[in-house]
UniProtKB/Swiss-Prot annotation:
Pathway: Cofactor biosynthesis; thiamine diphosphate biosynthesis; thiamine phosphate from 4-amino-2-methyl-5-diphosphomethylpyrimidine and 4-methyl-5-(2-phosphoethyl)-thiazole: step 1/1. It comes from Syntrophomonas wolfei subsp. wolfei (strain DSM 2245B / Goettingen). This is Thiamine-phosphate synthase. SUPFAM superfamilies: Thiamin phosphate synthase. The keyword Metal-binding applies.
Amino acid sequence: MVNSDYSLYLVTDRSLLQGRSLLEEVRKAVKGGVSMVQLREKEAGSREFYELAQTLQTELRELGVPLLINDRLDIALAVDADGLHLGQDDLPLPVARSLLGKEKIIGLSINKREEAREGEKMGADYLGVSPVFSTPTKADAPPATGLEFLASLRQEIKIPLVAIGGINKENLKMIKETGADGAAVISALMGASDIEGEARKLRQIWERN
């Protein structure tokens, strides 16, 4: 399997870039310390999504950083992405695994303990615990799970846990203290005017706690 460092996990959102280049901003984020990237494109058509994914995959492979595709198995296959991230209403994980193979990373979003248990049982490589805090980037997000839920999951679930939802410089230390393997960040990076600098600050917080 490809290198699976979930510690600082960037989830893209082009709507926060205010016209800036996605490729350039992702490149800066990686330079600042991002260890994994998920391309999340809810509005793009298939061709645009494919072209973005292809460009990012070429760039990130050279940098040694895995690219995961949100939801779209066809895009993940088409660009030979390093993995796929699935939600509870997306394609069933075992089906995705049968098509992607054992070497690819497959993550699953969970919001409940039973979903976490089922995800681990089905062979997810990691679980995205979402949202840990209330988040501005997902209007239809379920209620925040909170830190206690994340910490309690860590006591039960053996596969990596990645926290997502409302994570920033002010609360990243608390995420690390739960025993989570990583933090997925959207607006704290994608909305930053200096994405490299912000990524470096987040990386420093993670490393020293």
